[in-house]
Each structure stands twice: as C-alpha cells, then as structure tokens.
Amino acid sequence: MSQHLPLVAAQPGIWMAEKLSELPSAWSVAHYVELTGEVDSPLLARAVVAGLAQADTLRMRFTEDNGEVWQWVDDALTFELPEIIDLRTNIDPHGTAQALMQADLQQDLRVDSGKPLVFHQLIQVADNRWYWYQRYHHLLVDGFSFPAITRQIANIYCTWLRGEPTPASPFTPFADVVEEYQQYRESEAWQRDAAFWAEQRRQLPPPASLSPAPLPGRSASADILRLKLEFTDGEFRQLATQLSGVQRTDLALALAALWLGRLCNRMDYAAGFIFMRRLGSAALTATGPVLNVLPLGIHIAAQETLPELATRLAAQLKKMRRHQRYDAEQIVRDSGRAAGDEPLFGPVLNIKVFDYQLDIPDVQAQTHTLATGPVNDLELALFPDVHGDLSIEILANKQRYDEPTLIQHAERLKMLIAQFAADPALLCGDVDIMLPGEYAQLAQLNATQVEIPETTLSALVAEQAAKTPDAPALADARYLFSYREMREQVVALANLLRERGVKPGDSVAVALPRSVFLTLALHAIVEAGAAWLPLDTGYPDDRLKMMLEDARPSLLITTDDQLPRFSDVPNLTSLCYNAPLTPQGSAPLQLSQPHHTAYIIFTSGSTGRPKGVMVGQTAIVNRLLWMQNHYPLTGEDVVAQKTPCSFDVSVWEFFWPFIAGAKLVMAEPEAHRDPLAMQQFFAEYGVTTTHFVPSMLAAFVASLTPQTARQSCATLKQVFCSGEALPADLCREWQQLTGAPLHNLYGPTEAAVDVSWYPAFGEELAQVRGSSVPIGYPVWNTGLRILDAMMHPVPPGVAGDLYLTGIQLAQGYLGRPDLTASRFIADPFAPGERMYRTGDVARWLDNGAVEYLGRSDDQLKIRGQRIELGEIDRVMQALPDVEQAVTHACVINQAAATGGDARQLVGYLVSQSGLPLDTSALQAQLRETLPPHMVPVVLLQLPQLPLSANGKLDRKALPLPELKAQAPGRAPKAGSETIIAAAFSSLLGCDVQDADADFFALGGHSLLAMKLAAQLSRQVARQVTPGQVMVASTVAKLATIIDAEEDSTRRMGFETILPLREGNGPTLFCFHPASGFAWQFSVLSRYLDPQWSIIGIQSPRPNGPMQTAANLDEVCEAHLATLLEQQPHGPYYLLGYSLGGTLAQGIAARLRARGEQVAFLGLLDTWPPETQNWQEKEANGLDPEVLAEINREREAFLAAQQGSTSTELFTTIEGNYADAVRLLTTAHSVPFDGKATLFVAERTLQEGMSPERAWSPWIAELDIYRQDCAHVDIISPGTFEKIGPIIRATLNR
C-alpha cells in the first residue's frame, strides 16, 4: 500500500462540503468531447485506460480514521475498458446520449457511495460522430487537470495510431504536491501570506449578488442554470484593438466586474477569483484539485474609464498571485469565523486560458461541459480566444436565479460591450444597463397624471356636508353629530380660534385624547386656515416641549388635566376644549388655501431631536381624492378612527369619510392597543373600513377565533395596512379568518401618508412569492423611482434606492432648510421638480409593482437560527450600568476552528460608571429575556468600542474573548464523566473540571464533534456518534447517554414518552394517532414560542397500551397515568390527531373529573366514535369507508418515513393500526365540560356530517377551523403553515 497522505489544498473543503451536503452527486465534474471524423473506438478505449493509469490521483482511496481523513494511491486498482455504445439506429441519438450522461450524473456519486470515482463512455451517435463522456470526483481533479488528462489520453491515442510506443506520463506524483504543501505551511512564506490576506480581509467590502435573496454562507446547489454567451460579432475584438495597451484577459475581467457591480448596484463589492495555484510548484503538472478561490475586492469609480479599471484590477491580481497558495478556508478561519458561516464573496470570476483543444488527425473535437461542481451563487467563466473574440459561460444556482432573469442579465452584458466598443472613453458610471423599451416601461408605470381640483380639505368637507346635512357624520361613546351639526361645531371652534389670534398660515398644537372633540379640533384648525400639530400625550414632557419650541404654534388646544404639563413652555397660549360649543351657523369660512400647510407631524431624528414634517393642502387632497376613487366610500360606510393622531395614517381617517358622506366613529383612547376592545368596537358600530399597522394586525388576528371573527369582522369591507412591511403569511391568515379584502399601502411621513398601493388578498396575494406583500404601484400624480448610486434608473429586478416624486411630497422640514435641501433634492429627470430619497431599498417586479427589500441590518444565521444582533444589542443596553453594547458572532476557540460552524455569540459591553460589570449576573438577566440561541455565550467588558477611521463600529477589531473553562461546579464523576471531561480538555485546549461544561460553549463545533465521537468510541468501547454529542453536549448529559443500556439508547424515539422539545414554560402533550407514534408532531416546534415544551405520548410495542388494553378506556387510563407522572397538576394542554384526538378528549374529561384545569384541547380531524360505523355490520365486516380511511392514514404515515422504516417498526405500525380498529369497535365518548379547538379536513368530510352536531353531546364549547385538505394531510407541514399559527395564538392567550 502506498503512503497515507493528508488531504491538502482544495481537498479538505470538498470533503467537508460533501459530508455536510444532502446532494448526492454535487462534487462530480464531467464533460463530453464531441468527436467528428473517423475514430478507432477500440483503440481510443484502450488509450483511456492507459491515460487514466498515468494520473495517480485517479487511483486515490480515502478513509476516515479517528476523525482524520487520509488518502493513498491504490497501486492495485485497474481501470476497465470504457463501454462503447452505438446509438446510430436510435430515433434520437443525441437526446438518448444526453439522457445516458445525465442518468450517470444523477446517481449517488459521493466518495463513499461505492460507485467508481472515474467513469468514461464512448457513445456513437452517427457514422463519424462520437460523444466521449468523462466524469470524475472533484477530490481527484480540478478544472485545470481535467482537460490535461483528456489531452494525454488523446496524445496516447494519436501515438498508437502512428505505431509508436506509449508516451511517458507527464504528471507529477501527488505526493510531491502534498510534501510541498506541508513544507509551505511551516514556512515564512505561509506567514507572509497569512499577513497579506489578513489585511486584505480587513479591507474587503461586503459580498454582492445579482439575486435579491440574501447571500447565504453555504447554499451550494448542483442544480445549475448554464448560459453560454458568444461575442463573435467583433465588438469585443474591436474594443480590444482600440485599447491595445490592455490585455484581453484584463479587459474581459473589467467588463465582467463592471457588469456585476452595476447590476448589483454596488460599486464596491467582494467577488471570488479562481487562481490556478500551480505556477512554480510541483502542482503545475499534477492532477489533484489545487485551484483556489480567493476574495477579490472590486472597487469601481464612477469617473474612471474601462481601461483604467482593467489596469487597476490587473495590478491588484498581480499582487494577489504572489500569495495565491494560501487557502481560502484559512482566510475565513483566521478571521474568527468558520467556512459556511457567512459568505466571503458573491459571484466567482474565472479567466479560463486552459487549452481545451485536442489535436487528433482528421478529427474535430469540441468539449461540452456537463458538471463543474456546485455553485453557491453565480460563476462567470471568461474565455478570450486566439481570434480576439470572447466567450462567457454563466453558471447560476437555480435556487437563486431563474432562466428569463439570467437571459436578461446576459443581454445587458452584450449591451455593455457594445457601448464601450462605440466609445472606449465612456466612463464606468455613465454606461447604460437599461434594455431597449425599459425606459418606456418605467415611464408607463409612473404615468399617474390625473387632474384634480384646486381645493382644500375644508372645502371638500363643506361641499359634502351640504349634500347630506342630516346623515350621521361623527360619533364616539357619548356623542353623535350629523353632518350639519358637525359643521356647526367646526365653524364655532374655528371662529373661537380666530378670536384667540390664530391666522391663516399659523400652526395650532393639539393635545387631546381620542374623542369627537379631537376630530372637531383638527377640522376647525383647517377651517381657520392653519395647520394642525398633533401632540401624543404619551410622549415624555421634554420631547413635547422640544416640538413646541421648534413649531412655535400660535395656540395649544388641550384639556384641563393635560394643561399643567405645558406650563413651562414660554409664550404658549392655550385653549381647553372638551364640550360642544354654541352653534354659529355652518357656512364655510373659506380661509384655507391650497398652498397652505395642512399639518405638521414630528418624526424621530438622527441627531436625537425630532424633526417636523410639513405637508401641504394640495398634497393631502390628492391623496384623499385618489383613495376615494380607488376604494370608494358611500353613505353606508362606517370608518374607524383608532390610529394615534401623531401617526400620519390618522390623517385619512380624520378626513376621508367626510368627503364621501360616510360616518367616522372614534375608538376609546388606548383601545387600539387592545384587540378584544377592537373586536367589540367593530361589532358595536358595524365598522366597514379600518387600518392596522401590520404588527397590530398580527395581534388582532391572534385574538380571533372563527366565531369571534364572524361576530366582530362581519361588516368589514376593506382593511388597510401600512407603517411596516406586511407579511404575506399574515395576510393569508387574515383572509382565511375573515375574508375581508386587505390592502397594503406604503409611504413615508414626507409624502402625504401613502404613495403606493397593492392588493393583499385574492389572486394578487396568491401570486406573492416573497415573505412580504409588495408596496405596489404609485397613486395619482406621484412617481416611484428606483435609482443606483449614480442616480441612474435600475432595470426591473435590480435593487436600488427608492425615490419619490410628485404632488404629494412634503413642503420640507420645519425650520430645517439644510435638512430639507439634503433630503428633497432636484429631480434629474424633471427640471424644476423635487425628489425625496426614502432610504428604502426596493426593486421593480415583473408585474410593474415595487417590492420593498428593507434597509441594511445586522441579521445573520448561526446554524440555521436567524438572529437579529440589533435586538440583542437593545436588550443588553437596557442592563444596569451598561452605556454601550454590541453583539458579534465569532469563533471563540481558534484551535477548534478547523471547519464547520464554529461561531458563537459574544456580547461586548461598555460600563456607564467605568466600574467592573458583573457579567455573570447580566448574562442571567439576558436569559430571562432572550431565547437561548440569542444569549451570548460570553460577555466581555471593554473600556470603549473600537471605531473605524470613519467613526463607525469596527467589528473586525473587536477582540476575541480569552478562552476559559467554566468555573468548576460539580466535579466529573469517576468513569464516563472523567473520560469525557478529559476528551473535552484535549480537543478544546482548556482544563474542563465541571460536569456541566458544554462542549459548544467552550468553542466546540460540528467538525470537532466528529473527532470527539471517534475518540470516545475508542475509549469507552462503544460507538459514540456526532449526533449524540450534538444533543447531549455537556459532560454529564453525554455520560448519561453513553452509560445507558444499549437497548434503551437504540430505542430512543420508540418509548412511551417522546420529548420533542424542552422549554422553560408550560408543556403541550401530543397524543399519537393509530400508528402509535407521535413523531409527526415535531412540526410544532416551528410555530410554538420557545418557552413551550412539547412531549409526545406514544404506544410502542411490545406491551404498549394499544396492544394490551381490552378497550379504549383502558388506553386512556394508561396514558392518563403517564401524563400525571410528567405533570401532576394542571393547567394541561392536550393535542391529538385522529385516534389521538379521541384519546386526548377522553383524558381531558378524566382530568376535569379529578378537578384539574384543561386549558387547551386541540383535535386534528377527530370525530366521536359514535359517529363512525365501527360496529359489525355483516359477518365480521367493518364499514369499508372507515377501514379505507384508516388504511390511507397508515400508508401516509409509512410514506412519511421516506423508506427508512425497519422491519421492526413496520411490524409495530401494522400491529398498532390493527389494534386501533379493534379498540374503536367498542369505544364510547365521555362528556368534557370545557372548550375544544377542532381542525376539520374538508376534503374527506363525510357528506352530511356536522362537526357541531357530532361533538355537541361530548364537548361543551367548540371552536372550528376548516382546512382545505384531506384527513391524512392535516398533520402535514404544508397544512401546518395555517394550523400552526392558530395553535400558537390559542396557547398564548
């Protein structure tokens, strides 16, 4: 046997990626060479065998020993002659050949699959046409050595054709490469390279992607879109000729880099660049995988030319080539992260100058790529050819890109080359990436011009009041005014304001609770020609004082109890108003003008001082007239006023109804925060139109049951959402509960409430593919622009900055001309007009709607858990004596950073007092507030947070915490605990003396868990798996598993108690269906809040309750005993599916008989046994329909195991289903005097069956949720997307 060699260069990354991936053949590389001409196929087949034998990596074997992976050359391995397949008589030889090759690539071709890692075929598709198929595992070859092997085989074939002896192998033994690599790792060159890449990493800009989806750390897919672009029309050749001082490869790279940057709307981004890592090395003529993908920081200046960019990139690459031997994975590890945690770069660039040409006499050879390994995001292979033309192959991850989008992107690249060919001096920032017709398309989307009357709010309301003077207009719990009465009150108050000195153009502050008087005050202010300034009395006094100082209103309208709060505001005149005034007629005063300010609303400011936004009359008139046209109100409508008046959404609530003859009803103060109060409010007044902020809609939906939804929402005709991104799933839940049309509106305070709209119901909702509903289309006389950093429009699908134009823009910021000028800028596309930058990132969708993509944030994932670092920061900052706080994800234990996900959360704190913080106590407080995966494993106190040169937090400069073992608690016991603690110590590099020490909290990770499991397996003479380390990561817990009886360990998951999730709050008990197992309830973990524990109660065999019980009552009694062992007293939370629901209902009745509280009883398509025909109808023949349904449930459960069902499990399931039929033949229900929640599968509901009637003798109160599914699907993940949130909301009440 040859020498055992470690994996080197690209091999460790490939090995680990394949181990962590579920893809069966992702790391296969394959191509076929199309041979046209006369081919001696038997001779070529023998040449293949001879050529393969000359490349030693093709005879590599791999083994894993004690957590380490080794390779060696198997000298005994021989290659069989490749099969010769003749398809000439086939109807479709080409298609059949392609199918054969793809079938080979679809096999499980992992390195441990037992399939050959090297495979060739010769497929004849015509008399003089052959497909020479070649496939290798990526551990053996890379993109450089693959064609080199093909050329050597062709060389051998041609040599033999000439009758000459076999040429010698040109390939260097891979052992030489390994030895050279190991020497490099110990050399000064390695140290220099490490320092170089550490500096490069610090300066590296964030990665970018052409896909709108977040760029993950590890999501490589072998499902790849391939697009080949041939630039043979001479434009690239013409450009290269004009720029003769620039190498063609450099020019191609600059074009690709600019194309990516403009389509990502990022002028600074990180891409990957493939280096051969062979020059001056033994690897130059070796066949192993040594190519290296290293991060390339791309910086594009808008004012530079393409040759300038090409020259700069070439110089950058020249410097990087001196350090190209350094592993990309090591760069990540050096930065305290692990490969796959987060992306180092986005798209990968590859300049292919490899020689793919085969020189075979009288035979033309063309290579066609089939597989090159998985693609994380996007790869661009650039092929400048000898004729001066350029080919580009684009490989895209199908999970992130679709073919039409990719083709559009390719068209933009062609257009880019054409523009530079026409004008080589064109600046990078001036190149156009919009396709022909897209400017017209965007112009059409923004063609919103509608002529509106030159009028004001007060004029519109007076006009409507004249039409319907006696119609009900305004009401609260105490008062009801008709339109005439309302106008009389408005005019009387407006005259009083004028008496108090209010003049047209002034502002009047309003600090009133929600009532009819708040509405009357706002209307009176407008009637007097002034602007209203709403003050939220829930704000601190200092903040209100700042707003009054900035606005300097001529009057404050408030109440007697609020007036003392404003006593220290100088020169403030006030009016207390809380009762109707004596009418003085209703004739309009006509003091308000279209150019007047209508209202001033203060928003938060980056400086800490709020800023007042001034919105004009014409702006809000446009908004209201559009809304009435788009969502018309009539005299039959009732609009709810429940939005706080300091939130600009309230503006349309206060005025829209009164221009349409509708009625406005005022909710009680603070009622908008109480979903139950809103239910009562909607029902009492018959509300037809209302608004929710999405977060409040979620709370309201959570408060609804089907019954309360019918009672409180029956009159709702249209519901509006704005203020936050609107989750699509929430809309679907609302639609299912109420059926009331939901509409998504978007707009900042700086643009008269809302500037865009999108239906969030029906067909439009069904077509939403993202997580939130699009913000949609512009309203009347309003434009939406999405621009890049150079203020150029971006094409559909490309993210950019959202700007607003048109009539609804605010007049500016009160008393802040500097801020107004910086945010309301000149519109470059409409001379003389203004444009407002929202700060939101958005993109155009194919249907012309705008999709909101959010802003920059600190969201990340660690081992699949999504984490908002900002949320942790805010909780930490609220801790005692903490002035500043920031959370960072990093690898704590550098010695353990050998791959896999090694990151942990670290919290950095700055003390307010400067005294030492009790970090243990603070960490305990965090645990009371945050879910476990968001609690930092270490809190580190710093004198100050590190800042970058531009004054921002420098996360890369945050120090790694010093690795220390936990302060000793209980010492490990002799035996397994001592052995495990010693293994922890040796692998983690710290002295572990605590039985509760956690492997992962001390810096362990999934890759190191493999080594730990291997080491412990040797030491305890029993197999220990990495999975056991994952679920039992402390010394004590792992010892318990290892010391357990072998049969008990083997049967984990097959016992009566199935712990599905452990929390620190109440427990939901889930009862098995007829299968006897509760595994299907694991889906609940996705939906229940973290504090909930979930336990399944099962009936295993032998000797389970279903097998041993004479009747179903005995099963209930047995499970009741099990339940009481787990939880002696209530409240109890029970859930069951099918037969499990029958058991849960019976146990609930028994618990109530014992005086216990049953807080929740959930039934998943469960029916009383009395409603099913279980009795013998004929000679021992049960109801065939019932038996058929039981059989379908059994088959669905077995199918869900995806072929993993063992003989023992199969026998258990079959036996349990037989027992279920036996037990149900004599079953009877027991009355339960509580409330149950029933989910009904509508598709298999028996004709004429009523759940209300069926359960009324046995359950006192029943909530019913009907699901569009069959009985066997009600427990499926798809159905649980609807059921899960309902269960969560019900449990949380």
UniProtKB/Swiss-Prot annotation:
Belongs to the ATP-dependent AMP-binding enzyme family. EntF subfamily. One of its GO terms (molecular function) is 2,3-dihydroxybenzoate-serine ligase activity. This is Enterobactin synthase component F. 4'-phosphopantetheine is transferred from CoA to a specific serine of apo-EntF by EntD. Holo-EntF so formed is then acylated with seryl-AMP. The gene is entF. The modification O-(pantetheine 4'-phosphoryl)serine is found at residue 1006. SMART domains: PKS_PP (SM00823), PKS_TE (SM00824). It comes from Escherichia coli (strain K12). CDD domains: A_NRPS_AB3403-like, starter-C_NRPS.
